[in-house]
Amino acid sequence: MLIAQRPTLTEESLNPQRSRFTIEPLEPGFGYTLGNSLRRTLLSSIPGAAVTSVRISGALHEFTTLPGVQEDVTEILLNIKGIVLTSEYDEPVVMYLRKSGKGEAVAGDITPPAGVTIANPEQHIATLADDGELEIEFTVERGRGYVPAQMNKQDNDEIGRIPVDSIYSPVLKVSYKVEATRVEQRTDFDKLILDVETKPAISPRDAVASAGSTLVELFGLCRELNAQAEGVEVGPAPVAEETNPEMAVPIEDLNLTQRSYNCLKREGIHTIGELVSHTEQDLLDIRNFGMKSIDEVKEKLQTLGLSLKSSPMAFDTNNLEGGTFFSPEDE
């Protein structure tokens, strides 16, 4: 069986609701195959919760107004569609909003049952005057994708129940691009960059994980045709060479002198793990980084039980004969 190199997936968090995922290296052509499948699944098949119908006290249908309420019922329904929900229940549940007196009615004024969470409590629903009263009963259900109000209408609905367009999908935007990446001497491998933006109801990381789980289940149907059929096997995940948690500690924690610290940061060395991957000669090649700085770094690392990377060409400058060793700090 052919064995392909296992791709790696990394996440770059741009904000709590947007992340950029990079998957590489992929066999030529698989960037578009995987990217298109993930995008379509993320936009259409991630489960979520939404309001499916409402009952508004004093309103028999959406083409009416309420006394003491600035917005008409149609505008109130549009605002209700903007409520972002999560629900632990597979069956429909009910929540209520009761508001009176002058002020703004927002999603945070709704009283949801246990297991239902409103992710954007600041969502505006209506504006009430001094004599305004607003009482709404919401029906919340779980689903996928988008369901128009007509499909949420039931034949046995009581008079006054108004169906609402349901936007179940917790994913707002998905885009991807494919770039070339290099593996040894080959430069035709794919690098997939997937940009995902979600509602507060779910994180981009969980959304991508859900999409991946869905695709695995669906593609597994094809494998069931012949479980012994030969395909391309993905190699094992690479084993990390260093699992010491101190490798991720920033070099600021070493309390180096300002000169040494500035030299390392200018060279792009930000963590202890990056520092110990360099040899003494690597550091000496940094401008204004001399033996005093080397000794300081070695002393700080020694307190952590660490050391710089050894070099086969290392030599002891203290034993040089017939010459004088010069470092920038001797200036």
Curated annotation (Swiss-Prot):
This is DNA-directed RNA polymerase subunit alpha. GO terms for cellular component: cytoplasm; DNA-directed RNA polymerase complex. Homodimer. The RNAP catalytic core consists of 2 alpha, 1 beta, 1 beta' and 1 omega subunit. When a sigma factor is associated with the core the holoenzyme is formed, which can initiate transcription. Residues 1-226 are annotated as: Alpha N-terminal domain (alpha-NTD). Belongs to the RNA polymerase alpha chain family. The keyword rRNA-binding does not apply. It is an enzyme of class 2 (transferase). It comes from Bifidobacterium longum (strain NCC 2705). Residues 243-331 are annotated as: Alpha C-terminal domain (alpha-CTD). Its EC number is 2.7.7.6. It catalyses: RNA(n) + a ribonucleoside 5'-triphosphate = RNA(n+1) + diphosphate. One of its GO terms (biological process) is DNA-templated transcription. SMART domains: RPOLD. DNA-dependent RNA polymerase catalyzes the transcription of DNA into RNA using the four ribonucleoside triphosphates as substrates. One of its GO terms (molecular function) is DNA binding. InterPro entries: DNA-dir_RNA_pol_insert (IPR011262), DNA-dir_RNA_pol_RpoA/D/Rpb3 (IPR011263), DNA-dir_RpoA (IPR011773), RBP11-like (IPR036603), RNAP_asu_C (IPR011260), RNApol_insert_sf (IPR036643). The N-terminal domain is essential for RNAP assembly and basal transcription, whereas the C-terminal domain is involved in interaction with transcriptional regulators and with upstream promoter elements. Keywords: DNA-directed RNA polymerase, Nucleotidyltransferase, Transcription, Transferase.
